[in-house]
Amino acid sequence: FLVKINKIYGGNRMIIDSYDINSEPIVKLENFYGEKQHLVKKCMVIFSKVIYEYMLEKFPCRQIAEVRACNGNIPVWTLPYEEETIAFYLTPIGSALAAGMIAEVNHLTGASVFIMFGSCGSLDKEATDGKFILPTEAYRGEGLSYYFAEPQDYIKIKNTDKLAEFFKERKLPYVQGRVWTTDSMLRETVNLVRKRKEEGCIAVEMELAGVQAISDFYGFELYDFLVAGDVLIEGNYETDGLSAANHDLDKLFLALQIAKNMRIEGR
């Protein structure tokens, strides 16, 4: 990877020189929020506003924290579920924002086990049709992950086999495979789609590489599953499944069961 980049760019290391573990960060979350809190262990990362509003309406939710930003604060809630207290929040979209939110929520609440679910684009309709997608690796086509993990093309999704066991025990249809994390859906070009497919990617999304990198860096446990909404086929872009993939409630109740059953000691 490094040889390839250096050859192409004449030795200019650019983004691959961003991983620095030899000096301390100047900006720390304590500067904004004070000391770290320890309120919950598990948290769900919600992308769908429809699902988020359903949760607020149907569960006895309690706000426990707030992530502050100049363009609007994001509340963090808890809900009770089968003798568990589980946090949740509506995340911004995109690798940098979604990953940064996980770090802030950990500081504000103590949650270190994160369940993330949402829609994606299928690169292989035959493989993904009617199945939940459990990513095994994510192509790092974004920027944030290079600050939190050594430069490589792909990052491993370390809890994929634990999730696969959960799905298998419940006889839920699923497929495991590589995915592509991109920063720009408008640059999912024919050549790039073809290249990612040749490498074994079955889906494309916009958060996972960064979220996994920051989770690995800080010692969080991430459980991620996806549902294909659109299909990227050259000359025939299909969008029929987008609404269901984004907003159907089956993913919520599945995520709640995952949160309940993943017995991992939080930090």
Task: Name these PLM-found stretches.
Residues 64-68, 172-177, 264-267:
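Flexible, glycine/charged-enriched surface loops at secondary-structure junctions
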Residues 153-198:
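Active-site rim beta-loop-alpha module in soluble metabolic enzymes
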Residues 162-170, 214, 254-265:
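Generic non-transmembrane alpha-helical segments
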Residues 209-244:
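Zn-dependent metallopeptidase/amidohydrolase metal-coordination segment
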Residues 232-267:
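His/Asp/Glu-rich mid-to-C-terminal helical/loop segments that flank catalytic regions of hydrolases
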